[in-house]
């Protein structure tokens, strides 16, 4: 994480137990942007490691067990690392993602070093607008999402890959026809997630049928 390390050395904040840089003003809720320059300057001393309360709240709250007393010791378990990245998420983490389209943020919400912010507006984006074969509906949803998180993050295939997992976790069989179609798409993450979601929904439906019988 070179950007985080650069910000730390620049004295912007401290490293929390969850591995994130925490600043006095914004906590860990900010984005680091680097700019290359040939201007030389001495790094301030205020960027030394330390300062985290080590209360363990983030470790207890992490749904995937990525954080422990040593910090973010198992980043491969952090579900945020596999959200909207266009990669196949490990099967053990797919259910843990729940109904999150992007971001987990649980470790940030429970951190006592986070400043209090007013709740932001909700995006109001429905899953049925993403898990659909209606291209105009999907395009409108992508445009809306792009306005909030940027076009780079809201790439159509990345969104489809994550939306497929949400469909699988939704328990709603109405998504099965779309997932059946997506399972044959050439984009690996979309196809694999769609197959997993289809199997999960089908199994859930079978279990409900057996209980009814």
Regions found by a protein language model. Give the residues of each.
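Long C-terminal interaction/binding lobes of large macromolecular proteins
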Residues: 188, 193, 197-200, 208-213
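Structural detector for internal amphipathic alpha-helices that build alpha-solenoid repeat scaffolds
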Residues: 160-170, 192-203
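Alpha-helix N-cap/helix-start positions at coil->helix boundaries
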Residues: 118, 156-158, 173, 188-189
């Amino acid at each position: 994480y070179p950007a985080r390390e650069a910000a730390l050395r620049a004295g912007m904040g401290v490293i929390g137990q969850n591995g994130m840089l925490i600043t006095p003003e914004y906590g860990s809720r900010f984005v680091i942007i680097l700019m290359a320059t040939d201007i030389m300057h001495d790094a301030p001393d205020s960027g030394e490691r330390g300062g985290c309360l080590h209360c363990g709240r983030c470790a207890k709250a992490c749904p995937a067990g990525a954080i422990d007393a040593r910090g973010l010791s198992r980043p491969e378990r952090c579900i945020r690392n596999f959200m909207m990245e266009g990669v196949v998420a490990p099967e053990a983490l797919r259910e843990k993602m729940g109904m999150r389209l992007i971001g987990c943020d649980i470790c940030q919400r429970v951190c006592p070093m986070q400043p209090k912010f007013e709740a932001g507006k909700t995006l109001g984006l429905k899953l049925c607008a993403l898990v659909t074969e209606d291209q105009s509906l999907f395009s409108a949803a992508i445009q809306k999402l792009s306005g909030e998180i940027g076009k780079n993050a809201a790439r159509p295939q990345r969104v489809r890959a994550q939306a497929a997992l949400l469909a699988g976790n939704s328990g709603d069989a109405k998504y099965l026809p779309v997932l059946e179609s997506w399972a044959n798409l050439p984009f690996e993450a979309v196809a694999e997630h769609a197959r997993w979601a289809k199997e999960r929904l089908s199994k859930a439906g079978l279990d409900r049928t057996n209980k009814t019988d």
